[in-house]
Swiss-Prot record:
Molecular function terms from GO: homocitrate synthase activity
Function according to Swiss-Prot or TrEMBL: This protein is a Fe-Mo-cofactor biosynthetic component.
Name of the featured protein: Homocitrate synthase 1
Entry keyword annotation includes Nucleus: no
GO biological-process terms attached to the record: biosynthetic process; carboxylic acid metabolic process; nitrogen fixation
InterPro entries cross-referenced by the UniProt entry: AIPM/Hcit_synth_CS, Aldolase_TIM, LeuA/HCS_post-cat, NifV/FrbC, PYR_CT
PANTHER family linked to this entry: HOMOCITRATE SYNTHASE, ISOPROPYLMALATE_HOMOCITRATE_CITRAMALATE SYNTHASE FAMILY PROTEIN
Name of the gene encoding the protein in the UniProt record: nifV1
Annotated family: Belongs to the alpha-IPM synthase/homocitrate synthase family.
The species this protein was found in: Nostoc sp. (strain PCC 7120 / SAG 25.82 / UTEX 2576)
EC number, as in UniProt: 2.3.3.14
Top-level EC class: transferase
Length: 377
């Protein structure tokens, strides 16, 4: 696999999620954390939004981070000027490329949109800026027109082109083909930006990488517009564990990072969320728990410590004797097989009644109720 660069946009697209507002202090904390764990590039915001946004971007720019920082801009000269005022050395310029987007934003005048793009790239380059261009709604654009825009952007001085599945309508197979077309035609790197409207943001990001894209947009916990974006933790771990490529990210801190962003955004991370959900390494099923106790590889794709978790055995409706005895032995309680079965029966009954698994305290109380205190050592 080609070398892949993570360009995380939690501070831009992530904050565009409905109902999410980061304070300046939260933005600084998130930027520092992303930089600390080794994320090489951050899209830090939209200077044209106004003074408050500019203050946050300036604060991040003044941190002296190792990561490269970009500001997001429309194809408007005043946007570029605002980015320069924030101390940005890199800018991303977005331009609509689909018929539906050009009709809505430029009244169908695609020549006007291209001239705007050319003028903005020229202005940015004259300012000494590194320029990336993004084709907004690339996934629904005419492929020939999209390719023309990308080639023009390259000719006019862009150093990277972003393929955007803006409304998340692609599958991995189509993504591969569309990105491959750009990669084959351009000499500048291609970046993929995917959305999760059909639950395929991470899969589409990986497909774009397989097609030759050398940069990928992510957000922590998949935070973003509508159904969100490709999740940083999912992309990083998939590349590391499925493709065998270590991107230099400090993965044991991914859980801590996700908790920081979840708290700042007010987002509730589902327990079943890949990589960072609290049930990712929790086992209740008797067959699974027994297997994991014998060899964790039986039911885990990688060690929980690799992303900051610890393995957790849960007792409930689906538990078996091995889970119960293992948890009790951790608390110095050793039961014979008949006693263990009796406790297990009680666990299952209580779990059904409560419609959830039992806490450790509830399990220990069941043992007391069964009057097996003699088993404690």
């Amino acid at each position: 696999m080609n070398k892949v660069l993570i360009n995380d946009t939690t501070l831009r697209d992530g904050e565009q999620a409905a109902g999410v507002v980061f304070t300046l202090e939260e933005k600084v904390a998130i930027a520092k954390f992303l930089d600390t764990i080794g994320v090489p590039e951050l899209e830090v915001g939209i200077p044209a939004m106004g003074e408050e946004e500019m203050r946050a971007i300036c604060a991040i720019s003044n941190l002296g981070l190792k990561a490269n920082l970009l500001a997001w801009n429309r194809a408007v000269i005043s946007d570029i000027k605002a980015s320069v005022a924030c101390g940005m050395e890199r800018v991303h310029i977005a331009i609509p490329v689909s018929g539906i987007q050009i009709a809505a934003k430029f009244h169908g005048q695609w020549r006007v949109s291209l001239q705007r793009l050319k003028d903005c790239i020229s202005f940015a380059v004259d300012q000494g800026l590194w320029v990336a261009v993004g084709g907004e709604d690339s996934s629904r654009a005419d492929e020939n027109f999209l390719l023309d825009v990308a080639l023009y952007a390259q000719e006019w001085g862009a150093s990277r082109f972003r393929f955007c599945d803006t409304v998340g309508v692609l599958d991995p197979f189509t993504t591969y083909g569309k990105v491959k077309l750009l990669v084959s035609a351009l000499t500048i790197p291609v970046e993929v930006h995917t959305h999760n409207d059909f639950g395929m943001a991470t899969a589409n990001a990986l497909a774009g990488i397989k097609a030759g894209a050398s940069s990928v947009n992510t957000t922590v916990i998949g935070l973003g517009e509508r159904a969100g974006n490709a999740a940083l933790e999912e992309v990083v771990m998939a590349i590391k564990r499925i493709y065998g490529v270590d991107m230099g990210i400090d993965t044991p801190r991914l859980l801590e990072l996700s908790q920081l962003v979840a708290a700042a955004s007010g987002a509730n991370v589902p327990p079943w969320k890949a990589i960072v959900g609290e049930n990712t390494f929790a086992h209740e099923s008797g067959i699974h728990a027994h297997g994991v106790l014998q060899n964790p590889d039986t039911y885990e794709p990688f060690a929980p410590e690799e992303v900051g978790w610890e393995r957790r055995l849960v007792v409930g409706k689906h538990s078996g004797r091995h889970s119960v005895s293992n948890l009790l032995e951790q608390h110095g309680i050793f039961l014979n097989p008949e006693e263990t079965q009796s406790v297990l029966d009680a666990v299952r009954q209580q779990s059904i009644k409560k419609k959830r698994s039992l806490t450790t305290e509830e399990l220990l109380n069941l043992v007391k109720e069964q009057r097996y205190s003699h088993a404690a050592r």
